[in-house]
């Protein structure tokens, strides 16, 4: 199993590094990967610093990490070293304090998927994406206090925020290494969904010979089946 996270223990302080794409390669194919992450998180005590440099990836894997970090009993400090884009920005919202390097960026946009089928299946895919978007907005709203419509509009525009703008809007709390002498931090750069996707594809390992997920609806169907199986005690 290829982990996209790494824990480092230092006395009473812990550091978690999330680097590269948040891959769903084994996350949804079985229950092993989320259990492994939770076990790693629970294996130590004390406050934890989460370093993020990620172009994003799977929204459901990011949601699992977000929830696990919110449940963690110690203080969770998020530090964005370079990029928290797409699904990685969801993870960043789990921090009780979010700090960004002056040259770091946060990118938020609408969720996307690939759907194949007739018009009814297309409508179901659209409805599912709308619901997933509402879930993402929940995390942004809880952190920033911004109006949902305002957040939704930012996602529609696919917004790239430099450190200063992220602090101004409430997505981050402060800027690292800022001595107050120069408020002109990083200038914004342009990101597109395609550039984020290309970055993800470059970092992902070769796809194993295991069944993949076609779209978000497939994942939700699998989750429903998995929960039903567990509740009935089936194999």
Predicted regions and their residues:
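N-terminal organellar transit peptides
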Residues: 1-79, 83-87, 95-235
């Amino acid at each position: 199993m290829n982990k996209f996270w790494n824990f480092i223990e230092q006395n009473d302080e812990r550091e978690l590094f999330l680097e590269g794409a948040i891959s769903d390669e084994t996350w949804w194919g079985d229950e092993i990967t989320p259990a492994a992450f939770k076990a790693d998180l629970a294996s130590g005590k004390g406050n934890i610093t989460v370093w993020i440099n990620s172009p994003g990836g799977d929204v459901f894997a990011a949601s699992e990490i977000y929830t696990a970090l919110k449940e963690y009993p110690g203080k969770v400090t998020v530090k964005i070293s370079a990029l928290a884009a797409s699904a990685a920005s969801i993870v960043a919202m789990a921090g009780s304090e979010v700090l960004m390097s002056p040259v770091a960026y946060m990118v938020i946009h609408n969720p996307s998927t690939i759907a194949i089928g007739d018009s009814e299946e297309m409508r179901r895919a659209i409805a599912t994406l709308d619901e997933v978007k509402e879930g993402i907005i929940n995390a942004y709203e809880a952190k920033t206090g911004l109006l949902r419509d305002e957040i939704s509009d930012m996602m529609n525009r696919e917004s790239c925020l430099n450190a200063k703008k992220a602090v101004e809007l409430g997505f981050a709390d402060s800027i690292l290494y800022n001595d107050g002498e120069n408020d002109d931090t990083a200038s914004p750069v342009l990101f597109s969904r395609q550039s984020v996707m290309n970055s993800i594809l470059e970092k992902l390992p070769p796809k194993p010979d295991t069944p993949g997920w076609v779209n978000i609806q497939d994942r939700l169907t699998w989750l429903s089946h998995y929960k039903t199986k567990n509740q009935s005690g089936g194999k």
